[in-house]
Amino acid sequence: MFTLLKQEGAARRGQFETVHGTIQTPVFMNVGTSAAIKGGVSSIDLKNELKTQVELCNTYHLHVRPGDDIIYKMGGLHKFMNWDKPILTDSGGFQVFSLAKLRKIKEEGVYFNSHVDGRRIFMGPEESMQIQ
């Protein structure tokens, strides 16, 4: 649930309540594209030192590597990342544009050739939600 705490002109301050914690807005989100921050920052550092409120992960990249089957076997994304705070996952839609040379758009969704190993990947709305 989102609560608007203060507004002045076009600026707003609020908070999201999630089952994994509260996110104060505006917020800076670290991007852990494939469930990890580049540069050797650990989940403990993010929580304790950097006071990170939420982690952003990319659905397409998680699906390609490490793979949603591995994340599932590990007990879900929170356990895989050793992260107990909120996680925001995108739909993978940005890759429709950024990987334009590796994709084909159809009525039912998008077919990609993996940028890692070339394997064929399909992502429609249902697949995106399932991965997330």
Model-assigned labels for residue ranges:
Residues 1-131:
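Non-catalytic, usually N-terminal nucleic-acid engagement modules in DNA/RNA processing proteins
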